Amino acid sequence: MKSINDRYYMPVINKSFTGRWFESDMEFNTLYPLSIQALARCHWTSLPIAVKAAHFLAGDSDAKILDIGSGVGKFCLAAAYHTPKAWYYGVEQRKSLIYHAEVAKCNLGLNNVSFIHGNFTQLDFKKFDHFYFYNAFYENLDGTDKIDDSIDYSGELYNYYNRYLFKQLQQKPTGTRLCTLCSLESEVPADFHAIHSDFDGFLKFWVKV
């Protein structure tokens, strides 16, 4: 549950120096209250990974990229800053995390990023060109670190979400790009080929052929 301090946390931002927030993870994470910063190591994409994924996904001008399970928006915000000709959309079930993402977006003054409060199964995947996935379903499994207790968890949901994403990716056209981080790859159809990996294989770059 958010504290009063979390709810009204507003870092002092000088938008003339927006770039400094992207110089390090430590600097960027101070955009958020301490309770959110504490989750960064396990749950939020690091800046070096976000930058590499963004440059791969934003190969097309005006590409629309969906982050499935966007949390507090760190990937979307970093990607939007580094690839300003692409459009980033983050979908997240937890309203509290959407709040923190929106505050950070406003403070950074980024216009090519939007956040959607809801379940990714409610979205029309035809509206998006490429996808980023940081194993958002994994916390449904027993014994895993969970962000909070505000949503339901179960092995059944883990399997359902993986099957659903698999089917949506199956329907995407040739050339669709996908970046996965720390994924077990059960959501990746066979016609997506891994063309590169980085960060000891945890980050993978896929293209549908």
Feature roles, as predicted:
Residues F128-D142:
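Short SAM/SAH-binding signature in class I
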Residues W87-E92:
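Conserved SAM-binding motif I beta-strand of class I
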Residues S96-L97:
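Conserved short alpha-helix immediately C-terminal to the canonical SAM/SAH-binding motif I
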Residues K74-K85:
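Conserved SAM-binding loop of SAM-dependent methyltransferases across substrates and taxa
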Residues M1-D60, H100-K126:
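S-adenosyl-L-methionine
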Residues N140-V209:
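C-terminal substrate-binding/active-site "lid" region of AdoMet-derived donor-dependent transferases
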Residues D62-G71:
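Conserved class I S-adenosyl-L-methionine
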